[in-house]
């Protein structure tokens, strides 16, 4: 989130802020502080020290070391943007300018933008299906085939399917116990070879899904085989997840067999994410990362780092609420760093969530704090080269004109023009 997790055990929530941190001064100046080209280092937060001072805090290793390096220290760039109004803050390429071009021997011409739908909102949003196998399992052959047909008919080129693989169970979230996940074996009511082949034949590639549960060693042990599988069956994009409700709960298995718990935004995870994106490039796969580290512009060198979450996205409106002003905060905080997989496009804004999977009872308290017009505006304001239409087909069918906008709006733009804006109010 744009101002959330603490940087050490002694901090309480919001005693330190992730970057980009945006500040509006009394004289009207808007200041944003961030970092770029974060590789083989630890992520910084900014902690208030009184008298208007902010101090950089690095997420340490479990032994207290801030950064572990072999030969030389190469820190990320730290930079400050200053503008006399909020609109000018949005018109900057500094984060990309502080990163490097791809290596000369790397060809990323295979990276393509697109739009995708997903078997996902009916689990986390409408609560009518489950990730795990049950009579209401979402990732079953007949349902996925229906989604593929609907996506193809409406010119989407991707379909995310969550809950396709072995390891899901009702208590999977969110303790950090992700050890059982397999990233190569599908459950018995999901035929990955048939569905990927069928989707490819009608112009809709499966969007792969790797929820790790924050168990890094389990994922890295399977990384090569998992990416080989996706490359073989024609997957182009993978959404990865690291759901873990405790920030310092990433299990690291040390060479001697002991276990340490590392910070989600520390160097251990920075190195892991780097390994994932480089391995994905080898197999011509794009990564859409959820529960990521912050975007620091690495997409310039690795264009297959196509999008990421990194703030409270639409999913929180499924089981909680982002509030009405959250959407107009993000362009001036999280989105300053790069593309965001917010997953917009929810049209059924109330009477959408069932009390439990298989139930006919509606949770009357569940409301998405939005309007259809606002959901459409997100496709213009929230940049993501791989953009999602997150709602269910049955909800889009009710609103054909609005759905037509989602189908036709670009995901890549040749020019950006910020007409006017005011933080937390409009853009």
Where are these regions (language model features)?
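Glycan-recognition and catalytic regions of carbohydrate-active enzymes
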Residues: 391-427
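Conserved structural scaffold segments of CAZyme catalytic domains across common CAZy folds
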Residues: 9-210
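Long hydrophobic segments that form regular secondary structure
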Residues: 355-376, 380-382, 387
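Active-site-proximal structural scaffolding
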Residues: 72, 110, 140, 144, ...
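Conserved, mostly hydrophobic/aromatic
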Residues: 151, 287, 381
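Single conserved hydrophobic/aromatic residue that forms the stacking wall/gate
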Residues: 1-7, 11
